[in-house]
Structures are given as structure tokens and as C-alpha cells.
Amino acid sequence: PALIPWHVASVQAHIESLVASAEHVRFLWSPHAHMITVDRASRTDERRTPTQTSRIAPPLIKALLFASRFHASLPAPVSRAAFALTHARAPPVPRNELDTPGGLRPVRTDTAISVRVDDAPRVFNFDCLCEQYTTEYAVPFEYTGAALVAIRAWLQEEHARPDGERIHFPIEVRFVDADGIWLSPSYGRRTCYIGLVQYRPYRWPVRYRRLFARFEALMRQFDGRPHWAKTHTAYRPELLTL
């Protein structure tokens, strides 16, 4: 489908409003599904809520990811299927934002919402599903909107070509305050981390080198710094400039 144009200024304004809405904010962007999951967390004195996890979705998604290795047309429907398997359906009519559970004002009233109260380690740690290749870059917070618009345009170009790169899901976008740690990607500046992942279902290889190289080249245009624990090609001469 044709995509609604994104404008850098409006994207940045939405990001700034979103980040200010809770103590911890990240979102998971599924480009092929044209969907975004907003994940917001704040400290609370509420009691823990029971969590419900699907035993069917993880192995089914893994099998679909494996199948998507065999044809360039498959990652998009697999991404949409995975999103449907892991998210509740939107309400038939918009909800009253004052009745939203959890105390956080919803970003939208016509989308699905879920609320969880638990200890921090249980909230922030999650199952990565299967082995994966991953890369992540940290860009200055004020460049977030421009970087996301550029990534979207790049992925559109890739998807339009039969031999273009196909990205798995989701792209994780998270935010960190500036710190004073010399080797930290957030040293001296408020930061947006943008991370890509390519899954290896059943430990089978998957294409990732060219995709990651193009992503790195794009992030360098926004003064990006690599996450040390993930795939990157920045060596000493470049690191000295960061």
C-alpha cells in the first residue's frame, strides 16, 4: 500500500511528546506490517498483575521466519502475521481515554492496549525468540525524526527491488539520557538507540551483512555511535572521532 508521507519536524515533535509521557519509553517498529508498538513504563505502587503468554505464537513465528528465508516476497506477510499473533485486536469503537487502565494517557484511543504491572527485571527482560544477528546505533536525540524518516525511505527502496534486502521485525527504538561515561554511546548527549535484528531460526544462516552495512552507512550520516556489544564495523580511527 501507498505510505503516508512522514515529515521530519512532525515526527520529531511526536517523538518528543511520546518520550515525555513516561519514565521509560521505547517503540517497536514493524516496517513490513506498517505497525508500531509503543512500550511505556513508569514506577507504580500498584499490585503485580498476572501475565498471559501464548505457547503457540513463538514456535509458529519461528517456523514462519524460517519459511521467509526462501523467497523475497515472504518477509512482509510473515511480519504482518507475527504482529497479529502477538497483539490484541483494536477495539470496535474508540475507548474513553480517561478509562484507560494503568494511569498513562493513551497515544491513541482506537488501537489495542495492554497493561502489565511487575518487578522491573521481569518487565525489561524479554525472550529474544531465537538466535539472531543484531546491530544498534546511537544517534543524538534531536536527529531521531530525521533518522527514522531516512530509514523508512531506504527500506522502501529495498522493498521495491526484487533483490533488495528484507528486514526482520521489529526495529527497536529506545531513548537514553546523556551520561558522563567516556566509552558510552550516550556520552555527553541525549540519545536515541535504533536497533535492527535478523533472526536465525533453527540456527540456519540468514542474510544480514549487506543490510547491516547499509544501515551503518546511514547512521553515520546522523553522527551515530555503535553499540559495542552488537555487530558494527567501526574501528579505532573512526572511534577516535566519535
Residue ranges and their predicted role:
Residues 1-242:
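Noncatalytic alpha-helical scaffold of FAD-dependent oxidoreductases
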